[in-house]
Amino acid sequence: MPCNRSRPSLYSLSYIKRGKTRNYLYPFWSPFAYYLYCYKYRITLREKMLPCCYKSITYKEQEDLTLRPHCCLPCSCLPCSCLQCSESLGGLQVGRSTAQEKDHSQLKELYSAGNLTVLSTDPLLHQDPVQLDFHFRLTPHSSAHWHGLLCDHRLFLDIPYQALDQGNRESLTATLEYVEEKTNVDSVFVNFQIDRKDRGALLRAFSYMGFEVVRPDHPALPPWDNVIFMVYPLERDLGHPGQ
């Protein structure tokens, strides 16, 4: 019997969820007591045709298009769009429930040596993207922060405000050394907004350090808009270091 039904229906809705969560590593009066987060979701209602042409079922797909790392409030309030959590980092493909978001909202100390402290939301063997925060102590009262996401042997780092300062360069060197020695990351990606005033200086500085510009349509990149990515490939032997 011929099928007279039209094509299956498809409806899609996107929305953004923003907020802040408590960082219990610091007292509530500390400027680092809270982290900002931003999630972008897409809900799809899809009608699926059954073998019988007169019946169909509708099921819901929920996809988390954008997972942005929690940025501490002092970083997000700096006068530079690249560090505002709501504008800078957006988008690794991952699905999470509300309960999982609560579990992942608290960063725990993963490593500490010298001036470098590494915080993580999940064990590094987890399959979903994991937030890694690198805090590098500059003075007794100040530190440089690199906020990033670890996903499938790739680490995505947000370039902090005044990244070309000497202290931030030292913090990046310490971060790269940790990533190479303590994780199974193959490539480190840094990103910054296209409209940054120091874009030219960032391109020159990171190129000098061994980073290369990545074309926007590269399959390894998340779908972030108006962002320039640069990659630093880590030279590995036959095996990856275990965590």
From Swiss-Prot:
Q: For this UniProt entry, what's an example GO CC term?
A: cytoplasm
Is Phosphoprotein among the key words of this record? Answer: yes
Swiss-Prot/TrEMBL keywords: Cytoplasm, Nucleus, Phosphoprotein, Polyamine biosynthesis
Record's subunit section: Interacts with ODC1 and thereby sterically blocks ODC homodimerization. Interacts with AZIN2; this interaction disrupts the interaction between the antizyme and ODC1. Interacts with GGN.
Q: Which GO terms describe its molecular function?
A: ankyrin repeat binding; ornithine decarboxylase inhibitor activity
| Species for this entry | Mus musculus (Mouse)
Please name the taxonomic classification of the source.
Eukaryota, Metazoa, Chordata, Craniata, Vertebrata
Name the predominant localization. nucleus
Q: Which InterPro entries match?
A: Acyl_CoA_acyltransferase, ODC_AZ, ODC_AZ_sf
Kindly list the places in or outside the cell where this protein is found, as annotated in its UniProt entry.
Answer: Nucleus; Cytoplasm
The protein in question is named: Ornithine decarboxylase antizyme 3
The tissues where this chain's protein is expressed are given as:
Testis specific. Expressed throughout the differentiation process from spermatids to spermatozoa in the inner part of the seminiferous tubules.
